[in-house]
């Protein structure tokens, strides 16, 4: 149900962006068991400037993002989710922030100039609390570490290996880049609750996962090697 909305949104984005950029799209299907891959092929498979990638199994959103980055043939690569929780037009402000000394620009709804719309209070509290902990560990002091809406320098991220599945892997990507010396900046952004579908995030499991990742990244920082 999200794909027709995504197609219409990306058509508008391409029209807005093509005056400044050579826009190309990579669509990654993360081993779906429904008709997602067929619909993606129908909508985008034959379009100029579009590439489709299918993962053999569901490996999590971070693995899907990395697959898309590796499949891209440009040095600047942007990642968005298919239900457009963030407005892709915000990339017009984010892409110029990827200057020569920056390896990643992440959307930041928890930035003082950012905004969240219709997001449950428990999710806000959880996300801000986790950001506080990551801020104490990592070199790049950010307000938001959990957004998957980002702009990457391909050469800085394509060799990153993640071990976590789900959205936890998105944080692991950022953490591993941070501990490898990458400079990461954030752009104030507007976050809305998922427009299509229901979030499957389980609070207790999410907290345990983040605490485990924080522990491993702490060991990595102390020991100076992967954990």
Which sequence ranges carry the predicted segments?
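A conserved acidic beta->alpha catalytic loop
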Residues: 29-38, 84
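Short beta-strand/loop segment that forms part of the nucleotide-sugar
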Residues: 14, 18-31, 53-55
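Acidic helix N-cap motif at the loop->helix transition within catalytic regions
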Residues: 1-5, 34-42
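Terminal low-complexity segments of carbohydrate-biosynthetic enzymes
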Residues: 5-8, 21, 39, 212-227
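Short, well-formed alpha-helical segments that are part of the catalytic scaffolds
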Residues: 1-15
């Amino acid at each position: 149900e999200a794909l027709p909305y995504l197609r219409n949104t990306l058509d508008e984005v391409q029209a807005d962006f093509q005056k400044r950029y050579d826009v190309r799209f990579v669509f990654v299907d993360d081993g779906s068991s429904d008709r997602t891959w067929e619909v993606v092929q129908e909508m985008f498979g034959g379009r100029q400037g579009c590439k489709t990638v299918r993962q053999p199994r569901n490996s999590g959103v971070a693995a899907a993002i990395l697959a898309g980055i590796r499949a891209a043939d440009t040095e600047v690569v942007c990642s968005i989710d298919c239900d457009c929780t963030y407005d892709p037009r915000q990339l017009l402000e984010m892409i110029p922030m990827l200057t020569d000394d920056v390896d990643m620009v992440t959307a930041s709804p928890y930035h003082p100039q950012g905004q969240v719309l219709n997001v449950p209070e428990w999710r806000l509290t959880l996300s801000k609390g986790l950001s506080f902990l990551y801020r104490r560990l990592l070199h790049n002091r950010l307000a938001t570490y959990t957004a998957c809406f980002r702009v990457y320098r391909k050469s800085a991220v394509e060799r990153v290996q993640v071990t976590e599945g789900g959205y936890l892997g998105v944080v692991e990507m950022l953490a591993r880049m941070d501990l490898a010396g990458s400079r990461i900046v954030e752009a104030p952004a507007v976050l809305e609750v998922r427009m299509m579908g229901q979030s499957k995030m389980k609070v207790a499991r999410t907290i345990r996962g983040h605490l485990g990742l924080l522990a491993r990244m702490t060991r990595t920082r102390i020991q100076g090697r992967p954990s």
